[in-house]
UniProtKB/Swiss-Prot annotation:
SUPFAM superfamilies given in the database record: Mitochondrial carrier
Membrane topology: Multi-pass membrane protein
Domain of life: Eukaryota
Stretches that traverse the bilayer: 40-56, 109-125, 141-161, 208-224, 266-283, 334-353
InterPro entries: Mitochondrial_Carrier (IPR050567), Mitochondrial_sb/sol_carrier (IPR018108), Mt_carrier_dom_sf (IPR023395)
Gene Ontology MF term list: L-ornithine transmembrane transporter activity; transmembrane transporter activity
Keywords assigned by UniProt, alphabetized: Membrane, Mitochondrion, Mitochondrion inner membrane, Repeat, Transmembrane, Transmembrane helix, Transport
Compartment list: Mitochondrion inner membrane
Record-given protein name: Amino-acid transporter arg-13
Summary of the function given for this chain in its UniProt record: Required for arginine biosynthesis. May participate in the export of matrix-made ornithine into the cytosol (Potential).
Length: 363
């Protein structure tokens, strides 16, 4: 997943203050200036967050391909891959290194859509909390409130991500598992989209929605919680260091308005990405298995053929089948490589985003 940068929280706080001042100001000019500031903050969040997410996607995508291939190994056959390194070797031997980037066009679009949606719905979640009187508009939200707004944002974003990830998974795992009759699916997004629509209609694009919902709602809540907790710890540490050097109280207060150093933002982002990926990885595994099943059918038929005639499995049915076949370990295939790649990927996303905000401000 692509992360939501910390500086947006200050932007939302300023936007809330702007809304509150609109109720008391007697002239139109200050309101226009403040409204424009809030709009430009939101625009920066969306544009720069999307750009950072796309860059991050290029970094993490080969690891994501390996993860999906590990997750989607068939129930009734011996495992194709003994682990991430073996999957890397076999994949590069079969398709070359660029084969690990198969299907990246849809996720690149998804990275931009995901970030834009996260910012938009997170803002709505904050507005709901402020409107309900949960917190004054000129104050920062508590960590528990940020968990809520993150989960709220992730839940709505999952509706956008499920079709994108469905197409991505179909392309990343192109061969039908098992035996004779396996065919090579066309490895371009448009043909895959047409095939899904022809066999399953519009509803078919949301196959695996429950898994995406669990992963995104829970994952985004964990993202905000981990990110803000780590950032808060760093701010306290920095303030104590200032006081130890003899800084005045005014200097300490002023330091709270400045963004954290990039390396601290990177660590906070890395911890958030690792929490997001680890905590709800089993739901992502079940989703990947659902989304790599044959188009028009529900996956293998126990090696008896006629796979495409089998009905699609629900989330619960797929989870039970995986538990029966591999136990708890089956739900964590590819987890290690996913958590490890999420640390540098999330850190890089934050560094790109904050660099763009600092050197190319829109307002």
């Amino acid at each position: 997943m692509d992360s939501v940068p910390a500086q947006t929280h200050q932007g939302f706080k300023e936007a809330g203050a702007a809304s509150a001042s609109h109720l008391t100001t007697t002239t139109s000019l200050p309101t226009k200036v403040e409204s424009r500031t809030a709009v430009m903050e939101a625009l920066e969040d969306i544009v720069y967050g999307s750009a950072a997410g796309i860059v991050g996607k290029y970094i993490e995508y080969p690891f994501d391909t390996v993860k999906v291939r590990l997750q989607s190994q068939p129930d009734h056959l011996p495992l194709r891959y003994t682990g991430p390194l073996d999957c890397f070797r076999q994949s590069i031997r079969a398709d070359g290194f660029l084969g690990l980037y198969r299907g990246i066009s849809a996720p690149l679009v998804g990275a931009a859509l995901e970030n834009s949606s996260l910012f938009f719905f997170e803002r709505i979640g904050r507005s709901l909390l402020y409107s309900s009187g949960f917190a004054p508009r000129d104050s920062e939200l508590s960590l528990s409130a940020l968990w809520f707004t993150g989960g709220f944002s992730g839940a709505f974003t999952s509706l956008i991500l499920t079709p994108v990830e469905l197409v991505k998974c179909k392309i990343q795992v192109p061969d039908e598992p098992g035996g004779a009759g396996a065919r090579q699916r066309q490895l371009k997004p448009i043909p895959v989209i047409k095939e899904i629509f022809r066999h399953e209609g519009l509803r078919g694009f949301w196959h695996g929605q429950l898994g995406t919902l669990i992963r995104e709602a829970g994952g985004c809540a964990a993202w905000f919680g981990s990110k803000e907790t780590t950032s808060k710890w760093f701010r306290g540490r920095n303030e104590r260091a200032l006081l130890k050097r003899g800084a005045s109280q005014e200097e300490v207060v002023a330091s709270r308005e400045r963004p954290l150093p990039l390396w601290q933002q990177a660590i906070a982002g890395a911890s958030a990405g690792m929490s997001y990926n680890f905590l709800f990885f089993p739901a992502d595994t079940v989703k990947s298995r659902m989304q790599t099943s044959p188009i028009g059918g529900g996956g293998d038929n126990g090696g008896k053929g006629a796979a495409t005639m089998m009905p699609k499995k629900s989330f619960g049915e797929e989870a039970r089948a995986l538990w029966k076949q591999a136990g708890i370990k089956g739900f964590y295939r590819g987890c290690g490589i996913t958590v490890l790649r999420s640390a540098p990927s999330s850190a890089f996303i934050f560094m790109v985003y904050d660099g763009l905000k600092k050197y190319f401000p829109m307002a």
